[in-house]
């Protein structure tokens, strides 16, 4: 991450961090150590509590904003970029009272230009709710796809038989396992609770 911006660039440019949540936790201190007072670092991970806890005592905590855009597809990487991905989508912001209000105001202007709908939420509540409405559906999709592949030796035949309902249900199983494994680990307690109720 830091090799992408060197010297004075590290100090003057705001950064949006869109990497797996375990990588955010390992890199966030280093990033915050290299910024100026006028730089805002925005994390876009799918879990919030552990990341917010990681930076709570950092001297540049005021230069950090925890955000989670509720937008995306099952695909990842630069080739999966979509022009209007964030248009009219929800953006959850956590612990905004700990962010410098001038920097926050600038960020809100950017999000407004992106036509995003802002929801403010505590990081603990975010992780609890997102376990039900996002993480649980990904686990279900991964497990359905895995179950079918393990049980059906003739995969071509079973996929020929499968209708649009099956295709829709396993669509999320195409998502990056590396990205989602770290999300599941970071939010494991809430996910276990949601799974117990689901089963």
PLM features per residue range, with description:
Residues 1-7, 11-12:
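Single conserved hydrophobic/aromatic residue that forms the stacking wall/gate
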Residues 15-16, 42:
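N-terminal Rossmann-like NAD(P) cofactor-binding module of classical short-chain dehydrogenase/reductase
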Residues 16-27:
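Short, conserved structural micro-motifs that define repeat-unit consensus positions
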Residues 18-20, 45, 95:
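Glycine-rich, N-terminal phosphate-binding loop of Rossmann-like dinucleotide-binding domains
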Residues 27-79:
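Rossmann-like NAD(P)(H) cofactor-binding subdomain of soluble oxidoreductases
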Residues 65-99:
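Active-site capping/gating segments
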Residues 85-171:
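Internal alpha-helical scaffold of NAD(P)-dependent oxidoreductase catalytic cores
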Residues 155-199:
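Interdomain hinge/lid region at the active-site interface
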């Amino acid at each position: 991450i830091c090799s992408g911006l060197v010297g004075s660039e590290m100090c003057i440019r705001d950064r949006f961090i869109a990497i797996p949540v375990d990588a955010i936790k390992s890199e966030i201190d280093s990033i915050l150590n290299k910024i100026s007072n006028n730089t805002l670092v925005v994390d876009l991970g799918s879990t919030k509590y552990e990341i917010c806890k990681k930076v709570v005592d950092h001297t540049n905590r005021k230069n950090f904003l925890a955000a989670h855009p509720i937008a995306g597809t099952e695909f990842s990487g630069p080739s999966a970029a979509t022009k209007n991905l964030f248009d009219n989508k929800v953006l959850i912001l956590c612990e905004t009272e700990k962010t410098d209000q001038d920097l926050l105001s600038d960020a809100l202007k950017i999000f407004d230009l992106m036509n995003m709908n802002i929801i403010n939420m505590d990081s603990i509540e975010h992780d609890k709710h997102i376990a039900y409405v996002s993480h649980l559906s990904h686990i279900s999709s991964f497990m359905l796809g895995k179950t079918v592949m393990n049980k059906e030796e003739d995969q071509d035949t079973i996929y020929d038989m499968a209708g649009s309902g099956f295709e829709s249900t396993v669509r999320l199983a195409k998502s990056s396992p590396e990205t989602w494994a770290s999300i599941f680990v970071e939010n494991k307690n809430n996910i276990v609770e949601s799974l117990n109720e689901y089963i």
